[in-house]
Amino acid sequence: MIELRQLSKAIDGNQVLKDVSLTIEKGEIFGLLGRNGSGKTTMLRLIQQIIFADSGTILFDGVEIKKHPKVKQNIIYMPVQNPFYDKYTYKQLVDILRRIYPKFDVTYANELMNRYEIPETKKYRELSTGLKKQLSLVLSFAARPALILLDEPTDGIDAVTRHDVLQLMVDEVAERDTSILITSHRLEDIERMCNRIGFLEDNSLTNVMDLDELKEEYIKIQMAFDTDVNLAIREQNIPMLDQAGVFYTVLIPKSDEEKKSFLRELKPKVWNELPVNLEEVFIAKFGGKRRW
């Protein structure tokens, strides 16, 4: 469906992306992860052609988007904030988007507006953060695109609204085979929704793989010791997930027998091997406490 080939982009002399390649298939939800400033938003803006790559190619169903702008009618981008929407009401936004997206489904949009009880007469800027997110998603899905680019869609909203937003995404993919490329600092959302993920680090896209396969690469070990082994563990560059008294929880690659042997040599009184979640893998890859 969408294919990025060796995409590179520098902004103000700083290399943001370098030789990034990725293919997202029809009906796939792909999670894009990375620290703040790693280039996630830049990548979405490049696909939507809001900004242009210095080199590389973006294809939709084999057609180069830059040379065939009408292809963008199949793609919609939902940024973290959308100041363009601010001065318009729902109906005004529908009128605008119908001109851009010929497949825009007004009936479906109205149905979702009623379901989520979003005020139709208020201007976008007058809505709460949660309602803004829901309205943006309603408009994005009603445009009937093949690919939706979502930048932090659940940022700043309460738990109930977040649940509704996530369910709307899942339903859309299940019912219409829509593809979604999503960035989010809420790793539990990514873990719940995505088929595959990739990490943006050092200007490149790494570890593009099935989410379950990625989690299978690591093992979480909970141990208890008679003595303080904190320094010894950290000197081996073993990610420490938690320490509570004599209990230590670490994360290591399953294939790293050397680190596992080192931990065994510390003679733990307790040794429990546990499944991992995506946030723990993220910490293991990027180190330290999460700062994104």
Swiss-Prot record:
Primary residence: membrane
Keyword Magnesium: no
Any single Gene Ontology cellular-component annotation: plasma membrane
The UniProt record lists the keyword Cell cycle: no
Matching Gene3D superfamilies: P-loop containing nucleotide triphosphate hydrolases (3.40.50.300)
Domain ABC transporter: 2-227
Induction details: Negatively regulated by YtrA.
InterPro entries tied to this protein: AAA+_ATPase (IPR003593), ABC_transporter-like_ATP-bd (IPR003439), P-loop_NTPase (IPR027417)
Function according to Swiss-Prot or TrEMBL: Part of the ABC transporter complex YtrBCDEF that plays a role in acetoin utilization during stationary phase and sporulation.
Protein family: Belongs to the ABC transporter superfamily.
Name the record gives this protein: ABC transporter ATP-binding protein YtrB
Organism encoding this protein: Bacillus subtilis (strain 168)
